[in-house]
Curated annotation (Swiss-Prot):
Forms part of the ribosomal stalk which helps the ribosome interact with GTP-bound translation factors. Is thus essential for accurate translation. The keyword Amino-acid biosynthesis does not apply. GO terms for cellular component: cytosolic large ribosomal subunit. The gene is rplL. Transmembrane segments: none annotated. It comes from the Bacteria. Pfam families: Ribosomal_L12, Ribosomal_L12_N. Belongs to the bacterial ribosomal protein bL12 family. This is Large ribosomal subunit protein bL12. InterPro entries: Ribosomal_bL12 (IPR000206), Ribosomal_bL12_C (IPR013823), Ribosomal_bL12_C/ClpS-like (IPR014719), Ribosomal_bL12_oligo (IPR008932), Ribosomal_bL12_oligo_N_sf (IPR036235). Homodimer. Part of the ribosomal stalk of the 50S ribosomal subunit. Forms a multimeric L10(L12)X complex, where L10 forms an elongated spine to which 2 to 4 L12 dimers bind in a sequential fashion. Binds GTP-bound translation factors. Keywords: Ribonucleoprotein, Ribosomal protein. The lineage of its organism: Bacteria, Bacillati, Cyanobacteriota, Cyanophyceae, Oscillatoriophycideae.
Length: 133
């Protein structure tokens, strides 16, 4: 690596979680990109367009990784949902609030079906609507 990239890497290592989160948002805004992984991104390389039988083979494979996505919530239940989101994700209050306010947003990605169902149950009990993909 060049000296410039080494210096940038060292500066990134020194950032707090909050600063890193703010940096990601600024990069997303500046370059018009999203740091969120696309839903089902792991499955895309398996089926190549034009490959014979690619479409037929895909439905037979059982999905093993799921995403729990917070889709909506009533505003009067926001505090209860924030508490559940913080306990599930381990995020700080500000990060959890930003996540909840930017629905629909994945809370956890690439998790087992049981874990996704548990997250869905907890959030629905708090009043939120959750999708599992």
């Amino acid at each position: 690596m060049s000296a410039k990239t080494d210096e940038i890497l060292e500066q990134l290592k020194s950032l707090s979680l909050l600063e890193a989160s703010e940096l990601v948002k600024q990069i997303e805004d500046a370059f018009g990109v999203s740091a969120a992984a696309p839903a089902g991104g792991m499955m895309m390389p398996m089926a190549m367009p034009g490959a014979p039988g690619a479409a037929a083979a895909e439905p037979e494979e059982e999905q093993t990784e799921f995403d729990a996505i917070l889709t909506e919530f009533p505003s009067d239940k926001k505090i209860a949902i924030l508490k559940v989101v913080r306990s599930i994700t381990g995020l700080g209050l500000k990060e959890a609030k930003e996540l909840v306010e930017s629905v629909p947003k994945p809370l956890k990605e690439g998790i087992a079906k049981e874990a996704a169902e548990d997250i869905k149950k907890q959030l629905e009990e708090a009043g939120a609507k959750v999708e599992i993909k």
